[in-house]
Amino acid sequence: VTALIAQGKDQGLDMSLLSAVLRINHSQPEEILKLARKHRPSLQGARVTVLGLAFKPDTDDIRESPAFPVLRLFREQGAVLTAFDPIAKPVEHEAMRGVTLANSTLDAVRDAEIVVLVTRWDEFRQLPQMFKNLNLSPLVIDGRRVLSPADFAVYEGIGR
């Protein structure tokens, strides 16, 4: 992203829009934390699941993954963390310190009080049915606006 800004400046382009997008992207983890605290002011001991560790779906690329800052912020608040990604398994990454890596979406959400969707994997669209089948109603924070708020008892979406 930094390279894109430099390239744009080299070509004489106004980079204010790209800079604004970058500022918004960097503020997303704090926004997610803010939405969680709206429902649970203290996150100490909260069971939080982060879904999606890859930078984007259908890849195992974790470079600049938006999940890592989210995990760090929740860890700083004392949350008990679980994460799942269908392909990416970054067990050695610093951001995964103290995070339980689940084997499936079901294992990841079964005991969660808060579920944060970070990457748009198609299988995460099955959450409403999964929650219904298991009689679960965690707070769902949809960081990608791919889920319908009407499908969840407690829903927060970035930009909604």
Model-found features: residue ranges?
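Structural/interface elements that position substrates and couple domains in central-metabolism enzymes
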Residues: 1-160
